[in-house]
């Protein structure tokens, strides 16, 4: 028996792309992003993207009303609950203190912490950029192409084989969201994994009669 077949089917892994402008965020959507991380963008860029793509969820620092959301969104879980937002927490203790149900939370982790994070029972966001709160000091970023025995790709080069393998493995193990700087190749890796898991519908169904 192939033990990998025991991976239970579940929801597809969502792709979050980091962007700092509305144009870059829109490009990410075109390349397969399900969510956009605009925490580094100015409010005007966030507003422009939301106007252009009202149905795409946005990750933003929302402690003020500058983003068109309620003030205190991340400081007061009750505000988050009333707004319908999901909170991203760096530690499971924070998630437990929030009082929100698991489906309204995401635990952010680096690839190295994925298995431990999944054991907590909360949906997990895997950060491949190395810049998130779950990355930890001194850890390398798979998105940069850095891994043991592999040199980093300078600048904004595409992710290496190690990064795509980490993305695929994250989806296979059950990560709810994968965050990346490179949407198109990571989307392909996640789609391949979801197809193997049996949770990605075919692009076209063809039926014929003999």
Model-derived segments and spans:
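Active-site-adjacent loop and "lid" segments of alpha/beta metabolic enzymes
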Residues: 2-31, 43-210
């Amino acid at each position: 028996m192939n033990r990998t077949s025991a991976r239970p089917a579940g929801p597809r892994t969502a792709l979050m792309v980091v962007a700092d402008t509305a144009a870059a965020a829109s490009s990410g959507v075109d390349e397969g992003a399900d969510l956009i991380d605009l925490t580094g963008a100015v409010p005007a860029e966030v507003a422009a993207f939301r106007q252009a793509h009202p149905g795409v969820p946005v990750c933003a620092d929302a402690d003020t009303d500058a983003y068109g959301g309620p003030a205190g969104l991340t400081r007061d879980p009750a505000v988050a609950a009333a707004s319908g937002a999901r909170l991203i927490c760096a530690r499971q203790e924070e998630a437990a203190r929030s009082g929100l149900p698991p489906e309204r939370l995401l635990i952010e982790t680096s690839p190295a912490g994925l298995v431990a994070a999944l054991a907590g029972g909360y949906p997990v966001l895997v950060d491949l950029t190395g810049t998130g709160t779950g990355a930890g000091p001194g850890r390398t970023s798979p998105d940069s192409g850095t891994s043991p025995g592999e040199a980093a790709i300078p600048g904004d080069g595409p992710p290496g084989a190690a990064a795509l393998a980490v993305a695929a493995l994250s989806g296979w193990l059950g990560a709810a969201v994968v965050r990346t700087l490179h949407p198109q190749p990571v989307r392909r890796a996640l789609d391949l994994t979801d197809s193997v898991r049996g949770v990605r519908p075919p692009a076209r169904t063809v039926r014929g009669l003999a």
